[in-house]
Design a protein with these regions (language model features):
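N-terminal short beta-loop-beta anion/metal-coordinating cradle
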Residues: 2-69
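Alpha-helix C-terminal capping segments
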Residues: 64-68, 86-87, 183-192
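Structural motif
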Residues: 72-73
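Mid-sequence, gly/pro-rich, charge-dense loop/helix-turn segments that line enzyme active sites
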Residues: 83-169
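His/Asp/Glu-rich mid-to-C-terminal helical/loop segments that flank catalytic regions of hydrolases
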Residues: 203-233
Length: 233
């Protein structure tokens, strides 16, 4: 049986630093402005990529990682604005679904957020979601829930924008800037994926201050969840 390769993608250095520190036998590779570390964790081959912020960066990085390393699955890690009821800074959302909240081709009969010829919502792999839920049982310091994560090329920081997004995605738990692009790329390339995000802010008028203050805490919680999940895959 071949060795399992797990790719983990984060947008910011703060979101992947802990993961890289836990890896063994690390080698660094680059592709244009993108970098990835290949190493080992928990008896598995691990590829850790820094995508940069935004959906285009995330899609390019994901396509490169899949082409270069042929991973068995992709995990997206990082921070997010918490939109789910009761979510607090530091809480973790297992993204079992991902969608674009800023795509509008409704004039041609598509659903809001739907890219033509693709699903309106991208479903995460149930085995990966299950491993994340198992990891949640031993995760300490924050609550964990599963649900929809929506992405757009904007940092959401107003209650008005939050209300608009919620009106289109009533079941949304979190909002950020990369997950849907990673999910779409994985779907198109036939690679199982899951999203793990920790809440750094509430996506309201204080989001910029909260994000700067709590990013490190959110990044650590998301990374710890990924590590516990990898131990169970």
């Amino acid at each position: 049986m071949s060795e399992q390769t797990i790719a983990v993608i984060g947008a910011m250095e703060q979101e992947i630093a802990l993961l890289r520190a836990r890896m063994e036998e690390v080698q660094t590779l680059s592709f244009g402005s993108f970098t990835a570390c290949a190493g080992r964790y928990a008896g598995k081959r691990m590829v850790l990529a820094l995508s940069g912020i935004g959906k285009v960066n995330a899609a390019v990085a994901t396509a490169w990682v899949v082409h270069q390393f042929n991973p068995d699955c992709v995990i997206n890690t990082g921070s997010a604005g918490g939109l789910g009821k009761g979510l607090k800074v530091g809480d973790v959302v297992i993204g079992d679904k991902a969608a674009h909240h800023d795509v509008d081709v409704t004039a041609f009969g598509y659903e809001w957020g739907q890219v033509p010829r693709l699903p309106a919502v991208f479903d995460a792999d149930e085995r990966l979601v299950g491993a994340a839920e198992q990891a949640a049982h031993v995760f300490e310091g924050a609550s964990v829930r599963r649900g929809l994560i929506a992405s757009g090329d904007q940092f959401v920081h107003s209650s008005g924008r939050v209300a608009e997004i919620r009106s289109r995605f009533p079941d949304i738990q979190a909002v950020e800037m990369e997950a849907a692009a990673i999910a779409q790329t994985c779907t198109q390339l036939g690679v199982p994926f899951v999203v793990i995000r920790a809440v750094s802010d509430s996506a309201d008028e204080k989001a910029d201050v909260s994000f700067d203050e709590f990013l490190k805490n959110a990044a650590v919680h998301s990374a710890e969840m990924v590590l516990k999940m990898m131990e169970r895959l």
